[in-house]
Amino acid sequence: MRIIFMGSPGFAVGALNLLLKLQSEVVAVYTKAPKPSGRRQRLTKSPVHIVAEKSDIEVCTPASLKSSIEQEKFGNFKPDVAVVAAYGLILPKEILNIPKYGCINIHPSLLPRWRGAAPIQHTILAGDQETGVSIMQLDEGLDSGPILKQKKFLIEKSDNYKTLYDKLSELGSDLLLKVLNEIEKQVPLKQSDNDACYADKVKDYKIYASDACEIAYRKVKAFYPKAFIKVENKRIKILDAEFEAFTSGQGEIINDNMHISLKGGTLIPKVVQMEGRNPCDIKDFVRGLKSSLTKKFIE
């Protein structure tokens, strides 16, 4: 089977590696173009790009697939199927119609719940008890195509964005293999648009004084490692935390261990990181402060 693989971040690498390990005929890899990264703004290739080059697979990095030139190039690979995993570009109808078995997508949520760009973060933010992977046939809508296979699992108390990302990536790779092995027998299941909800891209990682404590706690988990508070114009990331219910406040730091009183409870940071410094245990962090943050309020 001739496969075009389309993906960019680390989430997609597991699926590509599995296809290569099984000696599938990956005829081309489509990924986002290298972009400036780091302090020196050096052009950096996507994780998928790096894996493909090491395997001597042709890499394509178009800015768009809407032109007839790009569509003809795609068709010239004569793909039986295109596998899509966090690619980052919209696939027009002309591309969707080229592969014999269409374009199938690995989506890290239980569709139709959490269609869109940030399903893992929104799964945690909403307090969902379970999540999973959906292998779906792409259509012109936003993650609205029929489902080919789906598998779910319970979310553990210790899970955060990183742990779910890794679990879903591994599960997605395994589920993809089952779909490809049964590609001619698949019976697509239409999604219910009435049950759909959407996971917009997250742009704001701040924990606010007005947040309910449980929401703040979920933000720490969902936005790992980017959730932060601001105190006296200092930006402090919270990488791990617990919370205790029943007390209530408006963003006051109530003791020397930097416990934060919020609506419905107290957020208890465990691991934090000041801008420009390494992550550290909360006890080491407060020990290194020049002045206590007790009685101060987060912004």
UniProtKB/Swiss-Prot annotation:
UniProt superkingdom: Bacteria
Binding site for (6S)-5,6,7,8-tetrahydrofolate: S109, L110, L111, P112
Record-linked InterPro entries: Fmt (IPR005794), Formyl_trans_C (IPR005793), Formyl_transf_N (IPR002376), Formyl_transf_N_sf (IPR036477), Formyl_transferase-like_C_sf (IPR011034), Met-tRNA-FMT_N (IPR041711)
Molecular-function GO term, any one: methionyl-tRNA formyltransferase activity
SUPFAM superfamilies xref list: FMT C-terminal domain-like, Formyltransferase
Family: Belongs to the Fmt family.
Protein name per its UniProtKB record: Methionyl-tRNA formyltransferase
Source organism of this protein record: Wolbachia pipientis subsp. Culex pipiens (strain wPip)
Gene that produces this protein: fmt
